[in-house]
Amino acid sequence: MEPFDIVINNAGVQNEEDIDVNLKGTIGITEKYGIRPGIRSVLMIGSASGHNGSEFPEYVASKGGVLSYTKNVALRIANYGATCNSLDFGGVLTDLNLPVIEDKALWNQIMEQTPLKRWMTVEEAADWAYFITVTNHFCTGQNILIDGLEAGNAHFVWPEEPTV
């Protein structure tokens, strides 16, 4: 397999496998493919919840671990001239979030507490990923919170039992 210029860790789940997938999976992929000469950029997809703690405990812990690991990787690959950052999104309109989006009562509650009254589109997320991995050559070791100011209302806590 040809070496990669860019590694993007985008795996994420919200279930009993949070730590294994979100944190250990990110570490495993990065250690295998991202820590080497020739790497240009490693991108972690974190979560606003890693900053504000407003989701399920295992998920928050796994994404908080990704934030710390981002800085560790940035220090280790800087001597290759490479960058490592995390993009820590709030709500994103994906199929994985359909149960939340389709639960009108929950969706309305979330939108009441979301300053921009919308979630990020997949295209907006891709634009950020492109910028931080391709255009950027200097910013490194940063956990970049892109949440439409959801963190400004960090008192919102997800219900214990998600509505499906």
Predicted regions and their residues:
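Conserved catalytic-site loops of classical short-chain dehydrogenases/reductases
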Residues: D5-I6, R40-I45, A82-N85
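C-terminal substrate-recognition "lid" of short-chain dehydrogenase/reductases
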Residues: R118-I146, A151
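Conserved SDR Rossmann-fold cofactor-binding beta-strand/turn motif
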Residues: T83-L93, L145-D147
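Short, small/polar-rich loop/turn modules that mediate ligand/substrate recognition or access, typified
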Residues: A78, T83, C139-Q142
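Catalytic loop of short-chain dehydrogenase/reductase
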Residues: S41-N79, G91-V92
